[in-house]
Amino acid sequence: MKIPSLVGPDGKTSLREYAGYHGGGGGFGGQLRGWNPPSESADAALLPNYSRGNARADDLVRNNGYAANAVQLHQDHIVGSFFRLSYRPSWRYLGINEEDSRAFSRDVEAAWNEYAEDDFCGIDAERKRTFTMMIREGVAMHAFNGELCVQATWDSDSTRLFRTQFKMVSPKRVSNPNNIGDTRNCRAGVKINDSGAALGYYVSDDGYPGWMAQNWTYIPRELPGGRPSFIHVFEPMEDGQTRGANAFYSVMEQMKMLDTLQNTQLQSAIVKAMYAATIESELDTQSAMDFILGADNKEQQSKLTGWLGEMAAYYSAAPVRLGGARVPHLLPGDSLNLQSAQDTDNGYSTFEQSLLRYIAAGLGVSYEQLSRNYSQMSYSTARASANESWAYFMGRRKFVASRQACQMFLCWLEEAIVRRVVTLPSKARFSFQEARTAWGNANWIGSGRMAIDGLKEVQEAVMLIEAGLSTYEKECAKRGDDYQEIFAQQVRESMERRAAGLNPPAWAAAAFEAGVKKSNEEEQDGARAA
C-alpha cells in the first residue's frame, strides 16, 4: 500500500522538496532535473584540465582584441607607468621613534629607486625589465593565468653594487617532473606539506625549440634563513587550492564564440559588398546540373565548351560595364540583376553589446572600459562605473601587485642592510631577520583613479580634507602621486618664485573659487530642471 504524501501546488513535487531551496531540486517544470554537476574540490575541478585552460586563455589574449584590452586595463589601472614605493616600517613595534623611522624611510626609498628603475635593467636576470615592468608583467600574468611566479636569484658574476636579481617565470613551466600524475604532496608542479602549504616548485626548462630534452629544477619556496626564493602569488577561492584559476574561465566560451561571430559577420559583409551585379542565363535543369556537376560523356563536354565559348566571344565584343551610363544588349536568354546593398548589422550590434556586458562582468571591468565605448554615458553613470572598477582594481593592487612587490623589496632590503647601503636605527629592538614583516612594511602607489570631471574630483578632495575625512596622503595617492614629493616640490617652487621676485600665484586660488561657484550654479540649475 502506497503511503500518501503531501505535494506542492503543481501536484507532483513533494511538499518537502517544494518548501526547501529550489536550487537543489528539479526546478519549476523540471528544468533543473538534468543539471547534476559533481561536487569537487578546487584542485579536482581545476588541475585535470589546467594546461588546456591556460592555453586557451593565452590564445584569446594573443588573438582576441577584447581579451587583450582586458589584460591591458589591469596593467594600466593597477600599476600604471610607475609603481612607487612608500616605505612605512612599523616603528612602534620596532621600538624606534617616528622621526628616526622617517629618516630611515627616505634613505631606503632613494636607494630603492636607484636599484629598481635602472634603465639597464639590473634588477632583471634577463636584463629586459625594470621593476615597474616586472610588476606590470606579473599583473598581466595573473589576469590570464590566475597566478604569477617570480624566482629570486643571485648574480655572483656581477660587478654592480647589488647582486639580487629576479627572473619572471611563466606558470606554464611549473609542472610535475617528467609529467607524472598528481599525488597528495605534489600537485601541478607544487610540492606541498600535509597542511597544503607550498614547500617548493618544479620548474621545467623553456620548451623551445621542441627537440631539446626537457629538464626540471626544484626551487624551494624559502631559503633556510627565511629569504624568499620563489614568489608565487594567487588568490585562492577555497581551502586546498594549489594553483590559480585564470579570470577568463567563466567567460571563455562566450569570448571564443563572439570571435567566431565577428569573423562570420565580417565575411558576410564582404560577400554582400563583393558583387555589384549578376547575369542569369536560361538553361533547362538537366543542362544546368551537367554544367555545375560536370559532364561524363564527350558530347556533353563539347556542348559546355561551345556554350562558354559563345558567351566569351559575345561579351568580349560587348562587355557589360556599370561605371558608364550605357549597358549593352545581353546574350539572348540572359538577364542582368543589380545587387542592392543590404544591412549587414541585422541586430548584430545589440547582440554584441549583450555579450560584451556579460564578458565585462566576468572579468571585473566595466562594459565601457572593455568595449572602449563611452557614447551612451552621463556623468553619473560614468562615475558609478569608474568607482565599481576602481574598487576591483584596488583589491587586485593590494593582493596581487603589492604582494609581489613587497616580497621582491624584502629580498633587496636584506642585501642593502648587509652591505650597509642603509643602516638600521640604533635603538631598534628587533633585527631584520627577527621582524621581516615590520621592516618590510610598505605601501605601493600605482596609477591614479580615472577623473571623469577634473574640477569635481578636485572639489571632492578639498572638501574631504577640510572636513577631516581624508588626508593629503590619501588624496594624492588616488591621483597616483606621493604627497611628500608634492610638498617638497611646492616648497622648492615657492622658494624659486620668491628668489626670482615673482608674486605668489594668487590667481590660482581665485580661479579655483570661480570654478567652484560655477559648478555649484550648474548643479542648482540641473536640480531645478529635474
UniProtKB/Swiss-Prot annotation:
GO terms for molecular function: DNA binding; structural molecule activity. It is found in: Virion. One of its GO terms (cellular component) is viral portal complex. Keywords: Capsid protein, DNA-binding, Viral capsid assembly, Viral genome ejection through host cell envelope, Viral genome packaging, Viral long flexible tail ejection system, Viral penetration into host cytoplasm, Viral release from host cell, Virion, Virus entry into host cell. It comes from the Viruses. InterPro entries: Phage_lambda_portal (IPR006429). GO terms for biological process: symbiont genome ejection through host cell envelope, long flexible tail mechanism; virion assembly. Proteolytically cleaved by the viral protease during capsid maturation. The record marks A19, G20 as: Cleavage. Homododecamer. Interacts with the terminase complex composed of two small and one large terminase subunits. NCBIfam families: portal_lambda. Forms the portal vertex of the capsid. This portal plays critical roles in head assembly, genome packaging, neck/tail attachment, and genome ejection. The portal protein multimerizes as a single ring-shaped homododecamer arranged around a central channel. Binds to the terminase subunits to form the packaging machine. Belongs to the siphoviridae portal protein family. This is Portal protein. It comes from Escherichia phage N15. The lineage of its organism: Viruses, Duplodnaviria, Heunggongvirae, Uroviricota, Caudoviricetes. The gene is gene 4.
